[in-house]
């Protein structure tokens, strides 16, 4: 852990008396290099911009760049997939979000397996909420290689404002 202080001798890191991360923890022991996006949209990140084979090759190259830049910190590749997308259309339930089909999430898991990557499932709740969206992803979040990402900027708590019209927020009550 002390090597993570990068020579800082102030004693602020690691925090005295704080528990160390559990064995197998990714952070702070590894650097996560993630490619972000949605398979349906070229404008939402690299996951949708490139064909899968090309995207994975580019991710592998980026991992190698980071390994070369800092050989002392292992690199963990990741696919950060937007599983619930805020949108301008209210949809059938008026929540202004679209849930990606499970087959798309399964495709991302397959790509991650090919590249030894972890997966972040990102949720943009819009007029919905975490308590409504999270249970639908539970089978995936139970997998050890799958993690959860919350997008606060699309959390429209007033129940009226469409996503993208203002910056949303989360607080402890949401979680």
Question: Across the structure, where does each feature detected by a protein language model lie?
Answer:
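Substrate-binding cleft of extracellular glycoside hydrolase catalytic domains
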Residues: 65-67, 74-153
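Substrate-binding surface in catalytic domains of secreted glycosidases
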Residues: 152-175
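Alpha/beta catalytic barrel-like cores
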Residues: 1-98
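Residue-identity detector for threonine
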Residues: 9, 72-73, 107, 161, ...
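Alpha-helix N-cap and loop-to-helix initiation/capping positions
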Residues: 50-54, 96-100, 129-132, 166-174
């Amino acid at each position: 852990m002390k090597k993570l202080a990068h020579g800082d001798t102030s004693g602020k890191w690691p925090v005295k008396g704080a528990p160390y991360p559990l064995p197998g923890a990714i952070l702070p022991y590894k650097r996560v290099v993630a490619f972000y996006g949605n398979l349906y949209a070229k404008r939402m990140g690299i996951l949708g911009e490139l064909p899968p084979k090309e995207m994975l090759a580019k991710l592998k190259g980026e991992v190698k760049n980071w390994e070369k830049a800092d050989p002392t910190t292992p690199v963990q590749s990741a696919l950060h997939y937007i599983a619930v997308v805020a949108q301008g259309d209210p949809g059938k339930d008026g929540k202004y979000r679209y849930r990606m089909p499970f087959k798309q999430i399964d495709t991302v898991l397959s790509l991650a397996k090919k590249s030894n990557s972890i997966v972040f499932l990102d949720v943009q709740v819009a007029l919905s909420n975490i308590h409504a969206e999270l249970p639908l992803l539970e089978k995936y979040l139970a997998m050890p290689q799958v993690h959860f990402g919350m997008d606060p900027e699309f959390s429209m708590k007033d129940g009226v404002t469409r996503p993208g019209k203002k910056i949303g927020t989360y607080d402890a009550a949401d979680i």
